[in-house]
Regions:
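Alpha-helix N-cap and loop-to-helix initiation/capping positions
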Residues: 42-43, 116-124, 155-163, 193-205, ...
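Alpha/beta catalytic barrel-like cores
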Residues: 1-137, 148, 241-242, 251-258
Length: 260
């Protein structure tokens, strides 16, 4: 199958090749800049090009099926003159692109809890997708981020519905442009809740996402769902079964089976 295929089922199959993973290398210039400055480097386009070239120019084809790029990187080249996209394609690696434009606060007046967010970028997405496809991208990533409220031990219904609707709209647009969408409804692990709370919220979030996707006519074999393991919050101090990886695996599978 060509790395420039437009068959979404084939793209999904290739990205899920046995023994390979997807390289998440879509750091924004500001996020990358913090690392560069810490290493004593200036955060300039040229420095970012050199940094990214270290891995896009490496021999990754044996372990990586796809690489998610920041939009800036689609136009950058290695020192030998090949574009990053060309270098990845030469190894049979599919190119993806981060398409969301970050998070923005939700208003309490809509029923959201303090600190909850939705994701920016839908307004300009269709135009950008056409450009990304022309540049060789065949899959995309959009991240929603939902914290579990420390007072309520849950995510507000408003945040769940808003983020699920945005993910579904994004997926529909991607598919229309021959780009496979990675749907990422991330539930943040901040907090002191146990795994049971996370399980309940995972079921709510995944269930609403599946509903929103189906409502828009999105075929589930034309997306990749990126979700997390069902775990306690990072500040949880308890003991017992939630310390056991087998428990986490079982509850994660249960959440997926009950919703997807």
């Amino acid at each position: 199958m060509s790395v420039l295929s437009t068959d979404l089922t084939e793209i999904a199959s290739r990205l899920c090749s046995a023994g390979k993973g997807i390289l998440a290398s879509d750091e924004s210039p500001s996020t990358m800049g913090k690392r560069l400055v810490k290493a004593g480097k200036d955060n300039t386009p040229e420095t970012r090009r050199q940094y990214r070239g270290l891995f896009y120019g490496a021999e990754l084809g044996g372990a990586i099926s796809g690489a998610i790029l920041h939009p800036e990187a689609l136009d950058m080249k290695l020192d030998d003159g090949r574009s990053f996209v060309e270098a990845l394609h030469s190894q049979g690696i599919m190119v993806g692109v981060k398409v969301d434009e970050g998070l923005e606060p939700m208003e309490a007046s809509c029923g959201a809890y303090e600190g909850e967010t939705s994701t920016k970028g839908l307004e300009t997405l269709e135009e950008r997708l056409a450009t990304y496809h022309e540049k060789g991208a065949r899959f995309a990533k959009w991240r929603a981020a939902m914290p579990i409220c420390k007072d309520e031990y849950r995510i507000s219904r408003a945040a769940i519905e808003k983020n699920a609707a945005q993910l579904a709209a994004y997926a529909e647009l991607c598919i229309a442009h021959g780009i496979l969408p990675i749907v990422e409804p991330e539930i943040l692990i901040d907090g002191d809740h146990d795994g049971g709370v996370y399980f309940v919220e995972t079921r709510k979030v995944l269930g609403e996402c599946m509903h929103a996707l189906v409502q828009r006519g999105v075929r589930l074999d034309h997306i990749l769902l990126k979700c997390q393991m069902v775990t306690p919050g990072v500040d949880w101090k308890g003991n017992g079964p939630w310390r056991d990886p087998a428990t986490i695996a079982r509850w994660t599978l249960d959440a997926l089976r009950q919703t997807v």
